[in-house]
Amino acid sequence: MAKRDYYEILGVQKGADDKEIKRAYKRLAMKYHPDRTKGDKESEEKFKEINEAYEVLADKEKRAMYDQYGHAAFEQGGGAGGFGGFSGADFGDIFGDMFGDIFGGGRSRQRVVRGEDLRYDIEISLEEAVKSCKKDIQINTLVHCGTCHGSGAEAGSKIESCPTCHGAGRVRRQQSFFVTEQTCPHCHGTGKKIEKPCHTCHGEGRVHKTQNLTVTIPMGVDTGNQLRLAGKGAAGENGAPAGDLYVVIHVKKHHIFERDGNNLYCEVPISFTMAALGGEVEIPTLDGRLKVKIPAETQTGKLLRLRGKGITSRGYAGDLICEIVIETPIKLNEEQKELLRKLEESLEGKTLQRPKSSGFLDGVKKFFDNLGK
């Protein structure tokens, strides 16, 4: 089967300049690249054909031979190169331009590797969460070596660009029509060759260290909130900037209050006599004790809302919501029991004086009436 004309394959005129040829190749390679066509055999063959045409037409000497002799110029062992290397055509540059998100950008260059971010979990009390406080913490991290100041080299030692990756820290390889990029195996991504590594960090430029920090906890924080301490993470490689430290807040469970956002909830026990007659009770708040009036005929479960007595966060103050719990007296003596019996007798049949009982009895009557229908 006769080979197609290389200019025809790329869709350009014979007099096309280098820019037109490169532009045409990029457009077609993008269209038929195996990563996009996913196993389409016909597209793979077209991709090979496009590569072969471009390798010849992008090389001035090969193009001149092709223009004069056609495909015969590369027969009998004088082929276009079999795509084993980049040859005269800069495939690496083109694939880097087209698939930068896959291969990490265009032409390789030494990368500044920022330090790792660190996490520290801290537990605080509700009282500490409500008001701003300071906490001392210890973290194990990586810092720039004090001996070599992060260079990884002994004083006076030569630092040269890695001869393999030329300082990029990464190398590209072409296999068939695939271009891959990986960490340089000789410099391990540093992009440099050190004549005499630092005796303290052994050429790493970083050492492990325990650091003491003081963290300011802002008022109103809650469990799950994170505080970001910029530049307090691990030191970067090759003198690069440090990462950040994230302090994650955990607020301990409180023995009185439960929290929901900026609101606080608590139960307030009162006697059944106070519930019936009314009175005054002391309620705990974050600012101390507060006397609150209990209205007469208060039922269990009633909520008292104390506005602005909750948690203040970002300028907004929540409420303290108190649920009334009526306590039943225990260990009564005979005199007390007799008084309660007399009270019960005095209320017999007077359901209006027992609203819960009235509602319950009405509901029971309706239930049985419906069953009998």
UniProtKB/Swiss-Prot annotation:
Pfam families: DnaJ, DnaJ_C, DnaJ_CXXCXGXG. CDD domains: DnaJ, DnaJ_C, DnaJ_zf. The keyword Chaperone applies. Zn(2+) 1 binds at C145, C148, C198, C201. CXXCXGXG motif repeats lie at residues 145-152, 162-169, 184-191, 198-205. Residues 5-70 form the J domain. It is found in: Cytoplasm. GO terms for cellular component: cytoplasm. SUPFAM superfamilies: Chaperone J-domain, DnaJ/Hsp40 cysteine-rich domain, HSP40/DnaJ peptide-binding domain. A zinc finger (CR-type) spans 132-210. Its cofactor is Zn(2+). PROSITE patterns: DNAJ_1 (PS00636), DNAJ_2 (PS50076), ZF_CR (PS51188). GO terms for biological process: chaperone cofactor-dependent protein refolding; DNA replication; protein refolding; response to heat. The keyword Zinc-finger applies. Its main location: cytoplasm. InterPro entries: DnaJ, DnaJ_C, DnaJ_domain, DnaJ_domain_CS, HSP40/DnaJ_pept-bd, HSP_DnaJ_Cys-rich_dom, HSP_DnaJ_Cys-rich_dom_sf, J_dom_sf. GO terms for molecular function: ATP binding; heat shock protein binding; unfolded protein binding; zinc ion binding. Keywords: Chaperone, Cytoplasm, DNA replication, Metal-binding, Repeat, Stress response, Zinc, Zinc-finger. Binds 2 Zn(2+) ions per monomer. Zn(2+) 2 binds at C162, C165, C184, C187. Belongs to the DnaJ family. The J domain is necessary and sufficient to stimulate DnaK ATPase activity. Zinc center 1 plays an important role in the autonomous, DnaK-independent chaperone activity of DnaJ. Zinc center 2 is essential for interaction with DnaK and for DnaJ activity. PANTHER family: CHAPERONE PROTEIN DNAJ, DNAJ HOMOLOG 1, MITOCHONDRIAL-RELATED. Participates actively in the response to hyperosmotic and heat shock by preventing the aggregation of stress-denatured proteins and by disaggregating proteins, also in an autonomous, DnaK-independent fashion. Unfolded proteins bind initially to DnaJ; upon interaction with the DnaJ-bound protein, DnaK hydrolyzes its bound ATP, resulting in the formation of a stable complex. GrpE releases ADP from DnaK; ATP binding to DnaK triggers the release of the substrate protein, thus completing the reaction cycle. Homodimer. This is Chaperone protein DnaJ.
